[in-house]
Amino acid sequence: MLQQRSLKTLTRAVGVGLHSGQRVELTLRPAQPDTGIVFRRVDLPQPVDIPVRAEAVTDTRLASTIAQGSAKVHTVEHLMSACAGLGIDNLHVDITAEEVPILDGSSASFVFLLQSAGIVRQNAPKRFIRVTRPVQVREGEGADAKWAQLAPYHGYKLSFEIGFDHPAVDATGQRVEFDLGRGNYRRDIARARTFGFTRDVELMRANGLALGGGLDNAIVMDDYKVLNSDGLRYDDEFVKHKILDAMGDLHLLGKPLLAAYSAFRSGHALNNRLLRALLAQRDAWEVVTFEDERQAPGGFAQPAQAW
């Protein structure tokens, strides 16, 4: 039986929120089978649980935000991406502020935290949402067009194309494909950092955003070049970060996907629209388990090795 996964023990991290600049403490704790991933705002007078699901997403401007009533958690996508890449099904996430810490701007620190705590198999079948026919969402026309699609695939594959007209981005790949069954999330995707432009950062800070951002947790560019002294971690780091974000956004479905995801200039908003469109078309998906691990797609049978 292909089993669900959680942590062996708890682990903690301290950092700042990318947009709020607030200090935040994060505690990742084991959870029982079939719990799912549940965020808990422990800083509130009465702690509030926010279970991960597509419908819990309430804001997608600059990041993915989930909420339960008035309690919110912003910028969940990098932690969720690490959970997707490592196959984590059940997890308690205790947080002392309204934004997940940005750490180094990628998901690598979250991967390290999760693997340091130990990943264990649980005595319950891992449940997938398997896409049975294509579902697509689109936005804009012509040069402004954006789209994202899920199609049937025996595994989990993501293909993303960006369209940034910038010398530093043009010099790298603007399209990448990652197959969880053939690649290695930790090696190929996890270290890709979020990125932004100085002109946008100045505007965001004037509006009380990006207060925790800087060269130590993002790729920053002026109109011509990358400003980080250490350059890029991957030749195609920009588009690989979009794959990282997409994996996090799609893991907000609450169950791992068996599908081929493809997108052109998509973002948090379109990714969430895609999940909602999928769920609304009940004939486009089914829940499946694998009693025989040998029948499971590649990339899901064995937990990733520790660093």
Swiss-Prot record:
MF term (GO), any: metal ion binding
Binding locations of Zn(2+): 78, 241, 245
Pathway: Glycolipid biosynthesis; lipid IV(A) biosynthesis; lipid IV(A) from (3R)-3-hydroxytetradecanoyl-[acyl-carrier-protein] and UDP-N-acetyl-alpha-D-glucosamine: step 2/6
Record's GO cellular component terms: membrane
Coiled coil ranges: none
Domain of life: Bacteria
Known cofactor(s): Zn(2+)
Keywords: Hydrolase, Lipid A biosynthesis, Lipid biosynthesis, Lipid metabolism, Metal-binding, Zinc
GO biological process, one term: lipid A biosynthetic process
Active site: 268
Listed Pfam families: LpxC
Catalysed reactions, semicolon-separated: a UDP-3-O-[(3R)-3-hydroxyacyl]-N-acetyl-alpha-D-glucosamine + H2O = a UDP-3-O-[(3R)-3-hydroxyacyl]-alpha-D-glucosamine + acetate
Top enzyme category: hydrolase
Presence of keyword Glycoprotein: no
EC annotation from Swiss-Prot or TrEMBL: 3.5.1.108
Reported function: Catalyzes the hydrolysis of UDP-3-O-myristoyl-N-acetylglucosamine to form UDP-3-O-myristoylglucosamine and acetate, the committed step in lipid A biosynthesis.
Family, per entry: Belongs to the LpxC family.
Name of this chain's protein: UDP-3-O-acyl-N-acetylglucosamine deacetylase
Organism whose genome encodes this protein: Verminephrobacter eiseniae (strain EF01-2)
